[in-house]
From Swiss-Prot:
Keyword Metal-binding included in the entry's annotation: yes
Source organism: Salmonella newport (strain SL254)
Gene that encodes the chain: astE
Catalytic activity entry: N-succinyl-L-glutamate + H2O = L-glutamate + succinate
Active site, renumbered: E210
EC class name: hydrolase
Protein name: Succinylglutamate desuccinylase
Length: 322
């Protein structure tokens, strides 16, 4: 199964759906779904996902290179792994999504969207995670969902962590720093993301990794993310990564800007970078007689997007943590 990406993009079902490779067994579970199980018993399970948005290709290329290293035997596997290429049709078309944003649908939220390929895929991925985690006895469960951002950013690589009732484990946060993430953003409320679903329903330590800017296949400079790729290789092979000399900055979400109607106006232009700072009192958005302003001394914007569908998030506002 050294052609997993090509099969996924072409929508082709492989003639052989399972087999053995260098120290592990593999099973093709469906389009964009591949399970890897080491020959030796392990108590760690990892979801490695990318391509939830079809125009975010750099992480997909990174995963393809990692799989090639595993199949060639140059990389040893020490985790049970489920590799997920989230939205095969959008990946093949080179578009963010075909109908609706899948990363708003998880945790059963797909039921509130008009039925589409994305709603069916979100349901399929939920069931795939259920099967994967229930079929093993993993003591450690991680989910790394690899993305790229629509906009540029003051932090080239950053992580977004779902709301979690329990404290985050130090070794997980340390690994994120070792993977080159310059900032970590902590959600304070539930959401429909893939990582919130895996964290809430399966207790996984989950993070959305944002790695640079969305570009078409073949146009990515993967050297920008070599530190992340090296950290993933070390993780898969069970090699401890060195702690980052400069730990990631930490932010928490303090508010969400939501577009409710066509009267919505977001006062940020196309050049506004993620993590741009705004001073207290700054007018951020208006919708009819409703005004959204900065309420803390300084707030930072994340994922500003005035063109979202009504009812969806047009941006997050953050505050820096000590």
């Amino acid at each position: 199964m050294d052609n997993f990406l090509a099969l996924t993009l072409s929508g082709t079902t492989p003639r052989v759906r399972q087999g053995k490779s260098a120290g592990f067994r593999w099973r093709w579970l469906g389009h964009g779904l591949l399970e890897l199980t080491p020959d030796a018993p392990v108590d760690r399970a990892l979801i490695l996902s990318a391509g939830i948005h079809g125009n975010e290709t750099a992480p997909v290329e990174m995963l393809d290179k990692l799989l090639s290293a595993l199949y060639s035997g140059s990389l040893t596997l020490t985790w049970r792994v489920l590799v997920v290429l989230g939205n095969p049709q959008a990946l093949a078309a080179g578009i963010r999504y075909c109908h609706s944003d899948m990363n708003r649908m998880f945790g059963g939220r797909w039921q509130s969207f008009a039925e589409s390929d994305e709603t069916r895929r979100a349901r399929e991925l939920e069931l795939s995670l259920e099967t994967f985690f229930s079929s093993g006895q993993a003591r450690v469960r991680w989910h790394l969902d690899l993305h790229t951002a629509i906009r540029g950013s003051h932090h080239l690589r950053f992580g977004v962590l779902p709301q979690r009732d329990r404290p985050w484990e130090a070794d997980f946060l340390a690994w994120l720093g070792a993977a080159g993430l310059e900032a970590l953003v902590f959600h304070q409320a539930p959401g429909g993301t893939f990582t919130h679903f895996s964290s809430e329903h399966f207790g996984a330590l989950s993070c959305t990794l944002e790695l640079g800017k969305a570009l078409p296949f073949g146009q990515n400079d993967l050297t920008q993310f070599s530190v992340t790729s090296q950290a993933l290789s070390a993780l898969l092979s069970g090699v401890e990564t060195s702690t980052s000399s400069s730990p990631p900055l930490r932010y928490r979400v303090v508010s969400q800007i939501t577009r409710h109607s066509d009267k919505f106006a977001l006062y940020m232009d196309a050049q506004t970078l993620n993590f741009t700072a705004f001073a207290k009192g700054t007018l951020l958005a208006e919708e009819g007689d409703k005004r959204v302003t900065v309420t803390h001394d300084v707030e930072y914007v994340l994922f500003p997007n005035p063109a979202v569908a009504c009812g969806l998030r047009a941006g997050l506002m953050l505050e820096r943590l000590p």
